[in-house]
Amino acid sequence: MFHQIWAALLYFYGIILNSIYQCPEHSQLTTLGVDGKEFPEVHLGQWYFIAGAAPTKEELATFDPVDNIVFNMAAGSAPMQLHLRATIRMKDGLCVPRKWIYHLTEGSTDLRTEGRPDMKTELFSSSCPGGIMLNETGQGYQRFLLYNRSPHPPEKCVEEFKSLTSCLDSKAFLLTPRNQEACELSNN
């Protein structure tokens, strides 16, 4: 009898605790514009990589040697395409250029990376002004990435990202140092 009462109390305690400390919901962005053919222009342009979160630190290891990353997202030359250019400033000062092509998936919020059929990217809004969050999944990894229009967003933005991703089972967190000047983005 004691065990049943104890189990019932723990059960109700769990319900109350869960209702008080629910993770905040994040609203998913659509990858298609109002006309169903284009990526929303508000998400095009320059972005800075601020932070990452993942279930394990190994899923973020690719960012360990990075000081900062600046991206430019532009509409592609073909419909349903996005061109992403980046310049990565490594902690040793080197600048490493990168390019990707995302393919929009009609009727879905997924972005698919050209040449990486296993990789799926989903976009989410951020409560932080000028912010956006990505969820990247691929073979053997899942990570959340925080981007902002400013290289130094308010600390509150990073804390909210960390809190949200910890609710989503991310145990590892990485904040880019952003101590060095960002590398210049090339136009090609």
Swiss-Prot record:
Q: Which keywords annotate this record?
A: Disulfide bond, Glycoprotein, HDL, Lipid transport, Secreted, Signal, Transport
Q: Which InterPro entries match?
A: ApoM, Calycin
Could you tell me where this protein is found in the cell? Secreted
Q: Which residues bind tetradecanoate?
A: 136, 143
Q: Does the keyword Glycoprotein apply?
A: yes
Glycosylated sites: 135
Question: Entry's CDD domains?
Answer: lipocalin_ApoM
Q: Does the keyword Manganese apply?
A: no
Q: Where is the signal peptide?
A: 1-22
Give the intrachain disulfide bonds.
23-167, 95-183, 128-157
Q: Which GO terms describe its biological process?
A: cholesterol efflux; cholesterol homeostasis; high-density lipoprotein particle assembly; high-density lipoprotein particle clearance; high-density lipoprotein particle remodeling; lipoprotein metabolic process; negative regulation of plasma lipoprotein oxidation; reverse cholesterol transport
Tissues where this protein is expressed = Plasma protein. Expressed in liver and kidney.
Molecular function GO labels? antioxidant activity; lipid transporter activity; phospholipid binding
Q: Where the protein is mainly located, per its record?
A: secreted
Q: Name one GO cellular component term.
A: very-low-density lipoprotein particle
Q: Per its database record, what is this protein's job?
A: Probably involved in lipid transport. Can bind sphingosine-1-phosphate, myristic acid, palmitic acid and stearic acid, retinol, all-trans-retinoic acid and 9-cis-retinoic acid.
Xref: PANTHER family:
APOLIPOPROTEIN M
Sequence similarity: Belongs to the calycin superfamily. Lipocalin family. Highly divergent.
**Partners and quaternary state?**
Interacts with LRP2; LRP2 mediates APOM renal uptake and subsequent lysosomal degradation.
Protein name per Swiss-Prot or TrEMBL:
Apolipoprotein M
What organism is listed for this UniProt entry?
Homo sapiens
